[in-house]
Structures are given as C-alpha cells and as structure tokens.
C-alpha cells in the first residue's frame, strides 16, 4: 500500500499472507471469512501455496501465527453477464480450521452492496514505493474512495474494460495513495463492510487519475455461500 501507515495490530485480524511454498516468497494478501475459508484474487494462484494467519511483522517468526495449506481451491467460472474482469476471485478451503485468538478473527461478508462515494480501507504487505519495489515487513493501511466504474474505464483505456462491469473502482484521484504490487488478494473494506478484493491497477501505482480495480464481493455472495455450504451444484448469479 502506497501512502499509508503501518496497520494497527488489531485492525488486520482477518488479513492473511499467501506465500509460494517452495521459494517461500511472499505472493499476495487474502481475507479470512470464517475459520476454514479464505477469499483472495484468482491471479494469486500458484501450484503450491502456504497461508499464514495471524501475521503482523513478516520478518519475525512468533508462535501466535498459524500456518495452513489449501485443501481445495475454487474459481468463479460463470459466463452469463460476467466478463473476465469480474472473475478475479478465488475461494480457498484451508486444510484445517484456524483457532481464533486475540489477533485472528474473520471478516464477515457484506450485507448490502457498496455505495459510490464511500471511504474504504485497504491493507496489505505490498510495495510501499512505485515503480521501484520496497516490500515492508508489516502491513500498511490507507483510506481510499469508492469511485464510479466509468472513472476506471476512462483511466485505463489499455485494459479495454467493458461498458458495464461488476468490478469496483477505487482510489484517490489526486494520487499518492493506492494499493500496489503484492497487495493483490487483500480486502477493500467500505463503511466497515468487506466489499472488494485487490485485483488490478496501473503499472505505476498511486498516479493521479489512475484508480485501481477491485473484484466485487457482493456479486459473488451466492457462489461463495453455496460452496461453503457444500452445495454440489453452484448456480451462477443472473
């Protein structure tokens, strides 16, 4: 996160860190939505993933963090009214439930859709400088604004975004504050509700008039809840 500050240790209880297992390199963030399930971005997927829950400072090994592996991974493959931009979402079932603690607690799914103009909180261990990468040991947090989708469409002509989309657009139009590389998969929390997943942005982050794109959690609720409930057939939303 660019232009943010170190997160308060109590405001990131649901934030998880995804690593590539063999190289032990940090990949992405993710969000614990209950004891056994994590929501992140599909583009964070690797063949072998390690998930740390309850981490704050990545450089310090301490006994409060819990290590898990994906038992199952689910990708959103609905075609009707969804474009490729709307599908950057991955649901991971952990190999065993985590134990909640002082620094580990889930973030509940949203009860209503996000409202343009909302102030949203972002957080992650992504780079704090751009275009040079500087990865911090601790997660950084910042506030950005939920913008109209059309702003992102105009800002990123190279993406050729569709005229309408289920993707969220958020940032600070003056520049200086933004999610960036390796914040992917982490949460966008608007008015206290988990509304988005860090997806894509400009190569150089935090530029003026270049807000970033976030997968919209609310439009995937049925899919998420069906999978968690163990439903064999997952109906695509209309």
From Swiss-Prot:
The active site is at 43 (charge relay system), 88 (charge relay system), 184 (charge relay system). GO terms for molecular function: serine-type endopeptidase activity; toxin activity. SUPFAM superfamilies: Trypsin-like serine proteases. One of its GO terms (biological process) is proteolysis. GO terms for cellular component: extracellular region; secretory granule. InterPro entries: Peptidase_S1_PA, Peptidase_S1_PA_chymotrypsin, Peptidase_S1A, Trypsin_dom, TRYPSIN_HIS. It is found in: Secreted. Glycans are attached at residue 81. Pfam families: Trypsin. PROSITE patterns: TRYPSIN_DOM, TRYPSIN_HIS. Expressed by the venom gland. Thrombin-like snake venom serine protease. Displays a specificity similar to trypsin. Releases only fibrinopeptide A in the conversion of fibrinogen (FGA) to fibrin. Shows coagulant, esterase and amidase activities. Reversibly increases the permeability of the blood brain barrier (BBB) in mice. Induces the barrel rotation syndrome in mice, which is manifested by gyroxin-like, rapid rolling motions. This syndrome may be due to its effect on BBB permeability, and certainly also to other actions affecting endogenous substrates present in the endothelium, nervous tissues or blood. Negative results: does not have phospholipase activity, does not aggregate platelet, and does not affect the release of the neurotransmitters dopamine and acetylcholine in the nervous system. Belongs to the peptidase S1 family. Snake venom subfamily. Monomer. This is Thrombin-like enzyme gyroxin B2.1. It comes from Crotalus durissus terrificus (South American rattlesnake).
